[in-house]
């Protein structure tokens, strides 16, 4: 089952699409790209600290596999909007051209620009995850709001991710907890 919804993040001028799918490949897709043509994953879920996982720390794939054992895994895929995709591709290709022609100063500036563009994507992704945990999904737990253990994997620099930048947010549904009222 795949559900798709468009999400607009108020105040960020950034939209995107969020697809919810169920992991059926034993994490092969994210692991195949992690540490090869994309960066490692990042722990992002609000329940992570309760399991000894520092928010923002790199995901150790072996730890993820161990924690995921016996859990249904949801993949909340945040997809960049067309305007961010076009800007990202333009700067990425210019940076590669500068690098390949030996213009390291220009390449460095463009890589910084690319990081700034991609930080918008991460900001939108975090906002969507916070919203979704606040809303909660009944399939994860009847208690709402919720906190999830999430391993987020960005796909935006490999041939696979460059054409349509996105972030895989792998939710270990068995570890869902009710949020503490504030």
Question: Which role does the model predict for each range below?
Answer:
Residues 1-182:
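Intrinsically disordered, flexible peripheral segments
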């Amino acid at each position: 089952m795949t559900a798709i919804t468009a999400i607009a993040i108020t105040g960020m001028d950034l939209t995107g699409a969020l697809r919810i799918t169920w992991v059926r490949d034993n994490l092969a897709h994210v692991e195949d790209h992690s540490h090869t043509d994309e960066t490692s994953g990042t722990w992002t879920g609000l329940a992570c600290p309760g399991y000894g996982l520092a928010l923002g720390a790199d995901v150790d794939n072996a730890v993820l596999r161990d924690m995921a054992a016996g859990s249904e895994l949801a993949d909340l895929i945040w997809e960049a909007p067309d305007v961010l995709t076009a800007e990202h591709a333009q700067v990425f290709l210019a940076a590669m051209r500068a690098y390949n022609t030996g213009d390291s100063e220009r390449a460095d500036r463009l890589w910084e620009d690319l990081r700034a563009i991609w930080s918008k994507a991460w900001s939108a992704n975090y906002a969507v995850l916070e919203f979704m945990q606040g809303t909660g999904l009944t399939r994860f737990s009847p208690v709402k709001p919720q906190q999830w253990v999430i391993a987020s994997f960005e796909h935006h620099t490999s041939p696979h991710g460059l054409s349509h930048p996105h972030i895989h947010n792998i939710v270990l549904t068995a570890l869902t907890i009710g949020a503490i009222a504030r």
